[in-house]
């Protein structure tokens, strides 16, 4: 984890792409914060080998934005550049899950099988709770066929039927599970009656005024 205030700020506010060797170039500079001066910003990016980043700093009414890019010089990073945020989606999923719990739709220790259609027919879900899925302690592992199943649009039950999907009983080990968070998404859709995108907009993005997410 970052160990200095500058690194913490950069890691939290920017979505960087790391490269072995490269040097960022300031493509848009707005004054208002020491980090947004060209020498300071380039020094931090060069030190950590970042070649593409967007940084937004806001303190009350004062707002400063700067960005860099050498990955694709013809299309440098700008205010509206889209970034693939990958597993940051898990944080959003966790927040929406906790909001649903606060709203009484289900409980943190509700069994996942009871919240999913046909879930009771999946032995791999025996004893697995929402808490386990959130904490990566469900005992469910990511199988090599996960990506293919997603691309082919196969239901989650296809993976739950695989004998090797369960590495251990729930609560025994920490096993990072993309599939587990996918199940949380299925639970959210089933219990709210909404697809993930409008659900996230309603319960997370709009209340936070995240209009470009």
Regions from the PLM with identified roles:
Residues 90:
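Short, conserved phosphate/pyrophosphate- and ester-handling motifs at nucleotide-, phospho-/glycolipid
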Residues 1-31:
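Membrane-proximal basic amphipathic "stem/tether" segments
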Residues 93-94, 180-185:
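Well-ordered alpha-helical segments within folded domains of soluble proteins
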Residues 97:
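Short alpha-helical "switch" segments that flank and position catalytic residues
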Residues 32-83, 105, 155, 161-164:
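Short, conserved catalytic-motif segment at the N-terminal edge
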Residues 87, 175-178:
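Catalytic nucleophile serine of serine hydrolases
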Residues 79, 84-87, 100-141, 145, ...:
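Active-site helix/loop module of the DD-peptidase/beta-lactamase fold
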Residues 64-66, 146-170, 174, 194-213:
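Short, charged, amphipathic alpha-helices and their helix-cap/turn boundaries
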């Amino acid at each position: 984890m970052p160990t200095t205030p500058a690194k913490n700020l950069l890691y939290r506010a920017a979505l960087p792409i790391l490269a072995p060797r490269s040097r960022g170039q300031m493509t848009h500079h707005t004054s208002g914060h020491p980090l947004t001066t060209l020498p300071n910003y380039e020094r931090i990016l060069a030190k950590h080998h970042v070649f593409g980043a967007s940084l937004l700093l806001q303190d009350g009414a004062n707002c400063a934005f700067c960005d860099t890019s050498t990955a694709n010089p013809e299309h440098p990073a700008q205010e509206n550049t889209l970034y693939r945020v990958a597993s940051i989606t898990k944080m959003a999923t966790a927040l929406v899950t906790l909001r649903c719990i606060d709203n009484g739709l289900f409980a943190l220790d509700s069994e996942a099988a009871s919240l999913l259609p046909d879930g009771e027919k999946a032995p791999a879900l025996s004893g697995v709770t929402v808490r386990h899925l959130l904490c990566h302690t469900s005992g469910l592992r990511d199988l090599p066929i996960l990506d293919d199943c997603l691309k082919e649009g196969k239901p989650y039950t296809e993976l739950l039927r695989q004998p090797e999907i369960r590495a251990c009983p729930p609560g025994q080990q920490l096993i990072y599970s993309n599939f587990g968070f996918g199940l949380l998404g299925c639970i959210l859709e089933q219990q709210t009656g909404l697809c993930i995108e409008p659900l996230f907009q309603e319960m997370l993005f709009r209340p936070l005024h995240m209009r470009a997410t």
